[in-house]
Regions:
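Conserved ABC ATPase "signature" region
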Residues: 177-194, 447-461
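Catalytic Walker B motif of ABC-type/P-loop ATPase nucleotide-binding domains
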Residues: 223-226, 490-493
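Helix-to-loop junction immediately C-terminal to a conserved catalytic motif
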Residues: 110, 390
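Conserved ABC transporter NBD signature motif
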Residues: 118-130, 398-406, 415
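ABC ATPase nucleotide-binding domains
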Residues: 29-59, 287, 291-342, 562-591
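H-loop/switch region of ABC-family ATPase nucleotide-binding domains
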Residues: 259-260, 525-526
């Protein structure tokens, strides 16, 4: 058993270069100066770690968890009696409700828990047969690669190319090896055009790919990823998952990945770890566990409703099973809704960052009483547009009017009351010591914020420090804080990151309720399943311009990339499983 003290507030571990987050151990100049020179200047090679990623003498099992238990302080067990073996060349998916302990399980595997989190750990973790519980992190830094939920927190250099090379320099690899691996990784992840970009100018999805790439360059034996596709558009997510699959199948790298968007990862997984509460972990093949799992992708829920066996895990299998179902369901009646009065009017809005045009002469109107989804590839300008609408972000031209008022002309407090904004990095809005204090500051002690938080993610202790919450729990807290002010217009940037399916259904209901009160809601998201649940209208951005707009059923049906799973299986106008269930029930009662 190992007991570690918790880290000092504000000194969180940096996820990005191996289990310890210890990336500044090399002697000499600082990381930025070294990073700029390392690809152009020969230097002593130092210790070398040769060979392809994933390959080790003997192969076989890579990581083994034996009777693992973990708890924070005197709290209930987060993990209990966990046994898990990951073999070479295996992709294992970790799933479960928000706050069930997925990130903690990954932290135990990498050694971050309890070394950097505090808490009590029992049991043992073996890497290639050797215990890592009591060994220093530096001894496994090149063998376990880790990318956390906030990839930007691990960046220590200025540019993409420098960041990809930094970890290799700490391992003492020769410059020619570093150059080759950087080029291979840039091509592998499709980010060659970003090589010279400042990391601070990248979109969230671009940062995610750079963080993954910076780990891949070190050729780890085990790759541990916490929500790796949460900030990626559907196409980019497929590319990253295809890359991971190639590493698994061709190079024998083992991958352990925690993900809420099961529809993306389940088809690639060899096995699945399902955290079901009380610290218990169930391990098995995805098809077996998803039969009764409380968290399941839409395609599995559709299979349950239709009585298909075995349950489909991908769209191709579901389409084969669904032959005839679409005809039996018939069509949905088209409902003509009157155009609402615009709550937000935007004319020729432009945003420029340096030499990059992020938003290009955009015209749009957001109607009161409507939920509009803002979609597009990573880097298409969604976040820049949202910040410009709120009034805090820069504008290079154009006008924004919210009920006749330009938010940019208001004080910060005035803007927050008129236009609520949940940013992509929601934790930036948290600054107090406990969840209770954050809620009281948001609603003046009325209890409205806490009540909303309980609806989104039940059971978060009032005395918990916000920085100790999981990513999904922190997001839910920020959502409750912003929504408790009930602003006239609500803007949300990737609000479903870290949320399970149940929490997303609750969030969709909250947003629909706000829209029913006459508020305008704009949600920037890559989560096509959430769009199918909540949106009335969709705007699609490409290179800063609106390239498609209209009702959700028409826009998503036009785009294979943004279509939800039910639409891919049954075709338009079907978007959601609950629509299919309702129609089947109607037909059953009529027969």
């Amino acid at each position: 058993m190992v007991v570690r003290p918790p880290p000092a507030r504000g000194r969180l571990p940096r996820p990005g270069r191996g289990p310890a987050g210890e990336r500044d151990g090399a002697a000499g100049c600082g990381p930025r100066a070294r990073g700029r020179a390392l690809l152009a200047t020969a230097r002593p090679a130092g210790r070398r770690h040769a060979g392809a990623p994933g390959r080790a003498a003997g192969g076989g099992r890579v990581i083994e968890l034996r009777d693992i238990g973990f708890a924070y302080g005197d709290g209930p067990p987060v993990l209990a009696d966990v046994d898990l073996v990951i073999d070479e060349g295996e992709l294992v998916l970790v799933s479960g409700p928000t706050g069930a302990g997925k990130s903690t399980l990954l932290g135990v595997v990498t050694g971050l828990v309890p070394r950097f989190t505090g808490g009590t750990l029992s049991g043992d973790v073996l890497l290639d047969g050797v215990s890592i519980v009591r060994t220093p992190p530096r001894e496994r830094a090149h063998r376990i690669g880790y990318v956390g939920q906030n990839p930007a927190a691990g960046f220590v250099t200025d540019t993409v190319e420098e960041e990809l090379a930094y970890g290799m320099e700490q391992l003492g690899l020769p410059p020619d090896t570093m150059r080759r691996r950087v080029e291979e990784t840039l091509d592998l992840l499709g980010i060659a055009d970003l090589r010279g970009r400042d990391l601070r100018t990248l979109s969230g999805g671009q940062q995610q790919r750079v963080a993954i790439g910076s780990v891949l360059t070190m050729h780890p034996r085990l790759l541990v990823l916490d929500e790796p596709t949460s900030a990626l558009d559907p196409t980019a997510a497929e590319e990253v998952l295809a890359t991971l699959t190639r590493l698994v199948h061709d190079l024998g790298v083992s991958v352990l990945v925690a993900e809420h968007r099961l529809e993306r990862v389940v088809p690639f997984a060899d096995r699945m770890c399902l955290l079901g509460g009380a610290g218990r972990v169930h391990v098995g093949e995805p098809g077996e566990l998803l039969v009764t799992s409380p968290v399941a992708p839409p395609i599995v829920e559709l299979g349950r409703a239709a009585g298909w066996r075995p349950l489909p895990l991908n769209v191709r299998d579901a389409r084969r099973l669904a032959r005839g179902l679409a005809q039996r369901l018939g069509s949905l009646p088209e409902v003509e809704e009157p155009a609402p009065e615009p709550a937000v009017a935007v004319r020729r809005l432009a945003v420029v960052h340096g030499e990059t045009v992020a938003v290009r002469d955009v015209d749009l109107a957001l109607g009161g009483g409507r939920v509009t989804a803002l979609m597009g590839r990573n880097g298409s300008g969604k976040s820049s547009l949202i910040w410009a609408l709120q009034g805090s972000g820069p504008r290079s031209g154009g006008r924004v009017s919210v009920d006749g008022t330009d938010p940019a002309q208001l004080t910060a407090a005035g803007r927050r009351a008129l236009v609520g904004l949940v940013p992509q990095n929601a934790a930036d809005l948290l600054y107090l010591e406990t969840v209770a204090e954050e809620c009281a500051a948001a609603d003046g002690g009325t209890g409205a914020c806490r009540q909303l938080l309980e609806q989104l993610v039940p059971g978060i202790p009032a005395t918990q420090h916000p920085r100790d919450l999981s990513e999904g729990q922190r997001l839910a807290l920020v959502l409750a804080i912003v929504l408790s002010a009930r602003p006239r217009v609500l803007l949300l940037d990737e609000p479903t990151r870290g949320l399970d399916y149940a929490a997303k259904r609750v969030l969709a209901g909250v947003l629909r309720g706000l829209a029913a009160e006459g508020r305008a809601v704009l949600v920037a998201t890559h989560d096509v399943e959430f769009v199918a649940q909540v949106a009335d209208d969709v705007l699609v951005l490409a290179e800063g311009e609106v390239v498609s707009s209209g009702p959700v059923r028409r826009v998503v049906a036009e785009s294979p990339s943004f279509a939800p799973q039910v639409t891919k299986v049954l075709g338009p106008p079907w978007l959601r499983v609950d629509e299919v269930v309702r129609r089947l029930a109607e037909q059953a009662s009529a027969s």
